[in-house]
């Protein structure tokens, strides 16, 4: 998306842009062009308000620079927008996993994102069904492969989660069997550069796992009734074994996606067109059988509405984000987080409040151009931007940036104030 332009009019500016230095709201901006009577620049990132200051050097460098500060303060409300960070397709819309800098890197089927702020450099960890696990270094602007499906001994690598320290990644495996003799969860270590898979628990096939810091336990799912499993100590082997806590569905077999609230108070369980909530019991230190929070099991559609009236197509990964309004005006339950979730089938990102009110956050824009809601368009969140099967989402609280794994666009998109 284009940045906002600023034109400054006056006299005796000169014609050398390199001699003109401008700050807007304390942020430096580049002088794009100038004539003797006009300066053209753009609003720099994070320039929300403040004074506009100009310093103009003399043409020969012999005289002192002229400095001027506008009396009227600059006040500009920046709007968040969708952009493409990295990833591209060929002329036929195809792509594959290619490592390299952000200009060269490509993605085959990006689906699951984890924000990695535990290491020296800020990164994203990404994978898709069948792997590989890759690192997106946001500081070096490079993409590298950590572990492939074959290198890790996976039948069909699925999705992953960090432990509380960020030193361990747990990775699920859809091995396609009801036998408990197969490795279901592997773990990989930062100390080994996440390049070697070790067995963590053997169980029936599954798709997703999540670590709970409150009781230092790993939870994962299975296909059968979407059963929630817990990895517990096995005194016989000295390792871990799976214990089923409950079936998520009464009459259906299907996988789920899970996300635990930052303070551990509950877990959202997503699948079959709805989002369920499992409360954490602090007396038993265990999650309880879930109830429906938003949407209705087995009823697909598109409807940003309150609670059970909402309709999802294929809700996928979600992430919790602090809402400053809840901090200024505390809720009775003390919850300060909204939930943002990708809906793969509806090609959008939904926002869900703690009360279950579902609203469109981003995507499904530019509809008047071709009456489609999927596509690859950057721009304003709801009127312009489009996604194509967005699956993964992560949030960087420091920069207030969302990262989206846009599967069929084979790219990583961002939602931020540029």
Which positions does each model-derived feature cover?
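Gly/Pro-rich loop segments of beta-rich domains
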Residues: 8, 77-109, 140-158, 174-176, ...
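Blade-level signature of beta-propeller repeat domains, shared across WD40, Kelch, NHL, RCC1
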Residues: 389-418
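Short loop/turn segments immediately following beta-strands, especially the blade-tip
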Residues: 187-193, 231-238, 277-285, 415-418
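Ser/Thr/Pro-rich low-complexity tracts
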Residues: 1-83, 236, 282-285
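Residue position within the beta-strands of beta-propeller blades
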Residues: 125-127, 170-172, 220-221, 268-269, ...
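Residue-level detector of Asp-centered blade-edge/turn motifs that repeat once per structural unit
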Residues: 115-120, 162-166, 212-215, 260-264, ...
């Amino acid at each position: 998306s284009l940045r906002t332009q600023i034109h400054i009019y006056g006299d005796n500016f000169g014609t050398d842009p390199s001699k003109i230095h401008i700050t807007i709201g304390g942020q430096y901006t580049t002088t794009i062009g100038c004539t003797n009577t006009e300066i053209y620049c753009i609003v720099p990132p994070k320039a929300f308000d403040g004074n506009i200051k100009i310093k103009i050097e003399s043409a020969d460098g012999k005289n002192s620079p002229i400095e001027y500060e506008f009396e009227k303060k600059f006040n500009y409300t920046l709007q968040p927008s969708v952009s493409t960070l990295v990833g591209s397709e060929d002329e036929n819309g195809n792509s594959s996993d290619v490592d390299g800098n952000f200009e060269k890197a490509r993605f085959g089927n990006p689906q699951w994102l984890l924000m990695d702020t535990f290491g020296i450099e800020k990164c994203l960890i990404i994978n898709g069904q069948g792997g590989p696990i890759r690192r997106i270094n946001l500081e070096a602007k490079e993409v590298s492969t950590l572990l492939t499906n074959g290198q890790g001994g996976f039948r069909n690598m699925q999705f992953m989660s960090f432990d509380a320290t960020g030193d361990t990644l747990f990775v699920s495996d859809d091995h396609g069997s009801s036998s408990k003799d197969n490795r279901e969860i592997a773990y990989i270590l930062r100390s080994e550069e996440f390049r070697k898979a070790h067995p963590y628990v053997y169980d029936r096939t599954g798709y997703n796992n999540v670590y709970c810091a409150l009781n230092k336990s790993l939870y994962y799912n299975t296909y059968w009734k979407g059963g929630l499993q817990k990895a517990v100590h096995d005194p016989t082997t000295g390792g871990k074994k799976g214990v089923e806590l409950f079936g998520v569905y009464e009459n259906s077999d299907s996988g789920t996606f899970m996300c635990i609230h930052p303070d551990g108070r509950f877990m959202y369980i997503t699948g079959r067109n709805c989002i369920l909530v499992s409360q954490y019991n602090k007396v038993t230190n265990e999650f309880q059988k879930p109830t429906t929070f938003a949407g209705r099991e087995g009823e697909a559609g598109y409807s940003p509405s309150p609670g059970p009236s909402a309709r999802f197509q294929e809700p996928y990964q979600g992430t919790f984000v602090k809402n400053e309004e809840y901090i200024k005006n505390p809720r009775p339950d003390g919850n300060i987080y909204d939930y943002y979730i990708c809906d793969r089938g509806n090609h959008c990102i939904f926002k869900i409040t703690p009360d279950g009110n579902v609203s469109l956050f981003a995507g499904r824009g530019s509809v008047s151009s071709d009456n489609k809601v999927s596509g690859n368009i950057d721009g304003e969140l709801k009127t312009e931007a489009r996604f194509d099967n967005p699956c993964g989402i992560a949030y960087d609280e420091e920069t207030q940036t969302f990262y989206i794994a846009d599967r069929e666009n084979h790219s990583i998109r961002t939602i931020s104030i540029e």
